[in-house]
Amino acid sequence: MVTATFKVNNKILKWVLQIADDKLGVDWIDKIKVWMKGEKTPTIHQLQVLSKKSQIPFGNFFLSDPPMEEIPLLKFRTINNDEVTKVSSELLKMIDSMEMRSDWLEDYRIREGYSPILFVGMGKHNSQQSSEEIAKQILKFFNLKEDWNIQLKSNQNAFNYLRTIITSHGIVVETSSFVGNNTRDGLNINEFRAFVLIKRYAPLIFINTKDSQNARLFSLVHELVHLWYGKTELFNYNFQTDPKYLNKKFEQRVNKIAESIIFNKKYFIRYWDSIRNSDFEKIYKIAKKFKASPMATAITAKNYKLISQELVNEINKETSQFIVKSSHTGGPNFYDTLAYKLDHNFASAVINSTDQGDTTYLDAFNLLNVKNMHAYNELKARVEEKNK
């Protein structure tokens, strides 16, 4: 009896490895690599088994090209990218995870009688005011002074401080540098720095912490401005000289508002004039003062007509050579890190709903990214400690 086989297109096999590697064991990954080399041809039965394991429809194995994924968020990239099909499995998983959390919290808050988040879409019909005026309105909404970040000790302090202020108004802020708890599923900073999901009751900002600490603040503020306008975005800004914006006029406006929130013009110029160094050195000193990245500082200085584009390019060339590596030596333990990555209000809501019997422990484990009751209780203890 002849066993039916089918030579699957290598594009399909490569795509399977990209999006389903976490569902396949080593044996299946090795089999697929052998098929890709042409050393063996898969049987129909093997493809049926692979379809179930990978959760990929059986018919997709007979296509000549991978199907286009309909991920709405990918349509809202800051910078145009012609290679739309080349989306990493890590990004897809992270979008799926954050959408699940945002959807759950949206339903929870509606059920519990919460009011919609006032900040979302406040600037939707506000197109006449200057970037500086809008920045002042946003600062006023959060009760922040114009020099709010100058007095803080470090980049991390500034980020944490602003995150706390934002989340106190019901906006969800989640962070991570990899998918779930799998450090092998690292996020790529060249693919995206952050994204924002617009929801009336549970708007969510996600920050890719693979980015440097001094760059995260700009990403957070940039996405906050998108929330002000009520516009979803996948922030993949790369600080290039002439980026291919999908919506150039709007994104330039968002960037200028974000600049004004971080770099108040009056204080920026005052510090600039007080430093007796070269312009190159001034950029680094002011970046440290405002708890921002040298590139964001250089672009702002150019917009304030203090430096040339040539110096911006020089700063970009130097900073792009830096490789940021996070050190785990002497750092917080697993559960402290998990509690930090999760939005505190979200984690509290899940735990409260679970304790009341409205959410199953299995669903809670999935939402909070824990595997068992011990991990759940460890996380719960840290969340409750912060609530005191």
What are the residue ranges of the model-derived segments?
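Active-site hotspot residues in diverse enzymes, especially metal/ion-binding acidic/histidine motifs
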Residues: 1-388
